[in-house]
Amino acid sequence: MTGVILAGGKSIRMGKNKAFIQVEGIPIIERIHNLFRELFREVIIVTNEKDLFSNFNSKIYSDLIPGKGALGGLYTGIVVSSFYYSFCVACDMPFIKRSLVQHLIQNVANEDVIVPRTKDGLQPLHAIYSKKCIGPIRKSIEEGKSKIIDIYDQVSVKIVDEKEFLCFDPGRESFINVNTPEELISLRRN
């Protein structure tokens, strides 16, 4: 399985590249990258600023279809992955739990998507995708759609409800993302 980090966002609300924001003294991208290097045989970073990530010992790719947001990044990560399955996350999630990732990996059977569902809904940027998703993602992009979950009705999906994974991440910290300076300040206070 490949670990894919989507780091192509514009970070407009944050005002600077979210991947390099430090949480507990370590840039978020580094926290994720270190975990993924331990968990996966291949790690890919998808970004529109390849030079910023040149010091990471991973494969770095620009979007194959530029300007399509997370859906375009997901498409790129799955296409270039050497493996049938890819665990894909956003670069602004500083507290991804190893045990939760391992639990999701253990849920892989024959489905094309393995996605957790919290009380806030599906978490498509902390999920596993198969190569079978490539066609539906490309079709969604061509139709002008931007939501990852728009492909879910075209592939087989296994939803992992939070009651099944709360023992691995009781505070749901894996799904915390940092989008604004206010969220970062709040995160640092807690």
Give names to the regions the model predicted.
Residues 166-190:
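Glycine-rich phosphate/pyrophosphate-binding loop and the adjoining helix
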Residues 1-132, 138-145, 153-172:
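Nucleotide and nucleotide-moiety/phosphate-recognizing core
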